[in-house]
């Protein structure tokens, strides 16, 4: 948020974990006022569990509830959740409809183009989600079968936006890893914005770089070594304040020794 993100979402949270009062899931509901507007993202495939999760989430007073229908990871998909629900669009629509009905907050959806190349029906799916009341849809430009291979197909996302029936905001996700690509998303494809994930890992400055370029094509310099070190120290302090010394230090060390952190440290 400090570096320009307009809206933030939490790490996705299992609806089953929430209703079992799993400590790890409950901890992810923590919201700091300086983060607003912030959405809490949940996943699941059982209607009763999802509705109970909505009640729990609303008690923490977020600004938005987001449903993750896009995670391609096997342990999520095998339970029919995340991108797994793309094999059962009627269930996807039913879950969404009931969550909208039972929530006082805006409900948004994150999803993918389809389960595989032969089942891409994102234009129809987006219409149905809009019809049951979602406030916005973010679409990752790959199928579940692709995982993160190949290139995100932004043109298929643009087809959703260009559908004259669509009135809600449509956001692109996937491979938006430069300010120039963000400009294409907005100015050439006419989408309402971008949901950025992997490009910001270890690089929180990315949001302000994108916003400066979208405003007048200003190219902001990459952060200096001093700024990077200060950011790392800040991350460590916040992690310790949030999760305690042992877990905070461990998770921060894991972050900064990951492949994503290697990319960040090399600029």
For each feature predicted by the language model, list its residue ranges:
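C-terminal helical cap(s) of enzyme catalytic domains, especially alpha/beta-barrels
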Residues: 203-219
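Glycine-rich phosphate-binding active-site loops on the catalytic face of alpha/beta enzymes
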Residues: 141, 191-207
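Catalytic cores of alpha/beta
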Residues: 50-56, 120-125, 176-193
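Alpha/beta enzyme core
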Residues: 54-65, 69, 74, 79, ...
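Glycine-rich, positively charged N-terminal anion/phosphate-binding segment
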Residues: 1-63
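Single conserved hydrophobic/aromatic residue that forms the stacking wall/gate
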Residues: 259-267
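Active-site beta-loop-alpha junctions enriched in small/polar residues
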Residues: 13-15, 43-45, 70-72, 112-116, ...
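Hydrophobic faces of well-ordered beta-strands that scaffold small-molecule active sites
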Residues: 8-10, 38-42, 65, 107-111, ...
